[in-house]
Amino acid sequence: MHIIYAVTTCSDRVYQQLFGDVKVKPAFQSQKYHRLLIEGLAKGAKVDVVANPPVNRSVLQKNFVQLPREEEGGACYRYIPAIRNPILKAAAVGIGTFFKTLFLIRKDSAVIVDGLNRVTALSAMLAARLRGRPCVGIVTDLPDMLGGSRFSKEFANFVIRHCTHYVFLTEAMNDYLNKARKPYVILEGHSDVTMKEKHPALEKKSHPRICFYAGGVSRQYGLKNLVDGFRAADVENAALHIYGPGDYVEELEAIAKEDPRVFYGGMLMNQEIVDRELEATLLVNPRPTEEEYVKYSFPSKTMEYMASGTAVLTTVLPGMPKEYHPYVYLLSDETAEGIAKTLKTVLSLSDEVLFDKGMKARAFVLEQKNNVIQAQKILEMLKRK
């Protein structure tokens, strides 16, 4: 089977080169999501990536840059030109993606797109439909529940509606979007199979104990409650480390200046984040569950957390299958007071108990939910008649 994966992305090598020293790293979550899925697909199919580099005018110094074709993770990356002028860039992305996809298609090809990369997805989808080949739409968020104009939401919904197959995060997402009952597969996420090469060890843990969060640093994601709850818990020999961008950063930096137990580390490359996760005692996801969008989501950070072998504390996300529950500590009360109480309880456990919990979670996601296994489910869906 031949997969043409059309998306806003680049190889990990190019991403490191472009953004390694940049304070704000664009599309860092989607970059890892797609890279892992591409590498997983490449274990069972030939993969060509029609890649629109995730660059903007602040990074791109030249008016026009054409990155060379390259191989990484078993896939071939074929780049759309990077152009500073936004109008010319949109045109180049649309036209370039369409023709690159069109000319790559063969009898055993299937096209995969990110339904939220509107121009890229539309262009690749049209090429697939023109050649009579399947087009798989990956949907990681509902357009109707994202910010942006009504036009941008309708545009994304149009692209998603005209795909022939789907990858959804949750069954609720399928019920909402897939009214025509087209073939679909639920992939709540995928862990990085190469994490098996890492060797977590209790003696490598930092002291004082570190409660750790990496991701969107915004009130919407429960960061204020996490910080307030941690400070109220006042657990001896423990610190809270937070990484990522968001609207809560300014207030968080002010708190970190006055409270030495709280540390804000800005944005780091993903490998640096993973290294710090291995050193932490507890990884926390405080995302509130009352918002409507939450039942349609599964934070990719959950997979990364669990694969690290460090114990995880998370809210009871409705999009998280119950098979995950035995492997994590669950936060049922999401208020600052509830977080404080739960942190006191969890951090009263011994290092050995917490480490054992984390290692069981690691075994679960690396053996049953890694990117190779999850990608194979997409290939199996495409093989079914």
Where are these regions (language model features)?
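N-terminal subdomain of nucleotide-sugar transferases
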Residues: 1-63, 165, 228-234, 317
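Conserved donor-binding/catalytic core segment of Leloir-type glycosyltransferases
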Residues: 4-6, 167, 203-231, 241
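Donor nucleotide-sugar binding/catalytic pocket of nucleotide-sugar-dependent glycosyltransferases
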Residues: 33, 144, 157-198
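Membrane-proximal helix-turn-helix segments that form the acceptor-binding/catalytic region
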Residues: 34-39, 99-106, 119-122, 126-131, ...
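A charged, aromatic-enriched C-terminal amphipathic alpha-helix characteristic of glycosyltransferases
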Residues: 44, 188, 334, 351-383
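Nucleotide-sugar-dependent
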Residues: 221, 271-276, 285-304, 314-323
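Nucleotide-activated donor-binding/catalytic signature segment of Leloir-type glycosyltransferases, i.e.
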Residues: 250-277, 282
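Conserved acidic donor-binding segment of nucleotide-sugar-dependent glycosyltransferases
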Residues: 328-337, 345-351
